[in-house]
């Protein structure tokens, strides 16, 4: 809980405003000096200045000094987006002895200079209005307090593939207890189907070593043939019920979702109707059992970059080249054709593409709109493909037709887990992170993280890297004795609450609940301050702190002042 300075409770606002040049990002369009001078005359403003980079350490020190010298009890910074820098400035206020919620940030970069580059005079006037609005709102800001909750230093990892195994081991090595839940009867997931890597990696050996390490680690409890039935609680204190082979109730502080994905099951190219039409995964097993291959045709982007699955599965091209090289090294007389629209051997994998060329693997490019035609020709398979180089059709009769099947989400399992935990899914059924750049392994719900194929298609190395990242983020919570919750959250006026439960239906974070008085109440540990419930409440009984109705009115009326 914050210790508030005496001036936080004073009704008279003493506002300090800092306008940022952001190098030339803002000042090349907006007349920053003119904005700063204009602000000085506004009611409640006792200090105004402009700085080159307000986020620099020198300016942070300057802000702390000005707060103390001029007894500021509100601070407004006009600069870039609060999404990236609000926390920095709030911490500066806290270090200066001012409640961090007595801070307001105005975006005059993304919302002004960047979108009005050809209208500097109008951009300057708009910047004045935006800052004026923030000053009007800041006069009504009130200090907020946080409350502490204890943290259970235990993790639940859902999914026992290589991503889940990696996360569990990482956390266990850091000294945390881990519950590892897997719906299948063995750990390992999709990695069991890879016999070797593009660079010769022994994935079966690697996987066996990791499974043995997990089984021997006393900090990891393994629950096979088990699924999650229910999840309650919030960051630091979750309660999860398991069903299946190890039905029980678990207490833990964080959750890592590593549920994996599946190989696309083709309904095209005679797959399932001809024994010689197989996927790359099946070819890996065939490679161990076969010495002569004859003619092999591989078709890329099967189940990827299509109308149903518009994304690239990232691994298919590399897998095709890996297996093509393996075939040619085992049977140099084999004829291998790879039919492709775009070949994506990203990063160093281009080296293996050149190696395949050297081994006389033939690559045939076909147009996006003209997929190869595959049909039975007696007992054989007939493939007709348009070669864009010669602009004519080529007919091949392979001994093996290998389909580079993509990676698809396990939609039903993901949907059920998403509903249980209020987690977002994208249009393809994959779990979605909170922000692709700022929070790439976090869900919007605090204390819940994701990694591996549950997030999106990626190769094994990327799955391992993301699993380590998720474990690292989880450890930032598990390593604490307590967490502070509250601040910018919604609050409900019980006297006005009609118990209509609209807020319970609207909240995607499961924060509202019905208390023992029959009224709705907000769990501050779950609330993310999105304001959906406040906007939806028909009784107007809900207020979002730091964005109350009176503060909104002050913001808008100040912007519209002449």
Residue ranges and their predicted role:
Residues 1-5, 9-562:
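Residues forming the flavin
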């Amino acid at each position: 809980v914050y210790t508030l300075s005496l001036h936080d409770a004073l009704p008279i606002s003493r506002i300090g405003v800092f306008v940022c040049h952001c190098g030339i990002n803002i000042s090349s369009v907006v007349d920053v000096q003119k904005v700063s001078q204009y602000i000085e005359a506004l009611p409640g403003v006792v200090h105004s200045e402009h700085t080159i980079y307000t986020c620099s350490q020198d300016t942070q020190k300057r802000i702390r000094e000005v707060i103390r010298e001029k007894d500021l009890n509100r601070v407004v910074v006009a600069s870039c987006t609060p999404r990236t820098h609000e926390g920095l400035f709030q911490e500066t206020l806290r270090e200066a002895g001012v409640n961090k919620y007595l801070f307001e940030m105005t975006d005059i970069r993304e919302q002004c200079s960047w979108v009005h580059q050809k209208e500097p005079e109008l951009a300057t006037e708009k910047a004045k209005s935006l800052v004026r609005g923030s000053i009007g709102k800041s006069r009504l800001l009130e200090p907020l307090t946080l409350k502490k909750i204890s943290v259970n230093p235990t993790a639940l990892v859902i999914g026992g593939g290589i991503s889940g195994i990696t996360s569990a081991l990482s956390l266990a090595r850091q000294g945390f207890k881990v519950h590892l839940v897997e719906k299948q009867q063995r750990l390992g997931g999709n990695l069991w189907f890879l016999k070797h890597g593009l660079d010769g990696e022994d994935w079966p050996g690697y996987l066996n070593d990791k499974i043995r390490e997990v089984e021997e680690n006393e900090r990891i409890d393994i629950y096979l043939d088990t699924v999650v039935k229910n999840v309650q609680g919030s960051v630091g204190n979750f309660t999860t019920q398991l069903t299946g082979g190890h039905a029980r109730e678990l207490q833990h502080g964080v959750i890592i979702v590593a549920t994996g994905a599946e190989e696309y099951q083709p309904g095209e190219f005679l797959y399932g109707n001809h024994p010689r039409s197989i996927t790359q995964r099946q070819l890996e097993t065939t490679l161990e059992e076969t010495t002569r291959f004859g003619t092999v045709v591989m078709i890329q982007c099967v189940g990827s970059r299509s109308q149903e699955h518009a994304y690239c599965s990232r691994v298919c091209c590399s897998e095709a080249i890996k297996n093509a090289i393996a075939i040619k090294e085992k049977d140099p007389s084999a004829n291998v054709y790879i039919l492709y629209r775009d070949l994506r051997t990203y990063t160093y994998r281009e080296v293996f593409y050149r190696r395949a060329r050297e081994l006389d693997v033939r690559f045939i490019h076909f147009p996006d709109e003209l997929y190869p035609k595959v049909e039975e020709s007696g007992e054989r398979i007939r493939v007709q493909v348009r070669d864009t180089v010669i602009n004519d059709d080529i007919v091949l009769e392979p001994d093996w037709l290998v389909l580079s099947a993509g990676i698809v989400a396990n939609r039903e399992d993901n949907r059920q887990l998403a509903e249980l935990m209020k987690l977002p899914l994208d249009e393809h059924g994959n779990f979605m992170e909170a922000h692709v750049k700022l929070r790439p392994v976090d869900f919007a719900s605090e204390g819940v993280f994701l990694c591996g194929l549950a997030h999106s298609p990626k190769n094994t190395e990327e799955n391992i890297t993301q699993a380590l990242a998720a474990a690292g983020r989880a450890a930032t919570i598990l390593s604490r004795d307590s967490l502070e919750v509250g601040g910018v959250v919604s609050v409900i006026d019980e006297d006005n609450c009609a118990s209509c439960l609209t807020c319970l239906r609207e909240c995607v974070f499961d924060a509202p609940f019905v208390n023992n008085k029959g009224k709705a109440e907000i769990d501050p540990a779950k609330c993310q301050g999105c304001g959906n419930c406040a906007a939806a409440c028909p009784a107007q009984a809900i207020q979002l702190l730091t964005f109350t109705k009176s503060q909104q009115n002050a913001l808008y009326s100040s912007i519209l002042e002449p």
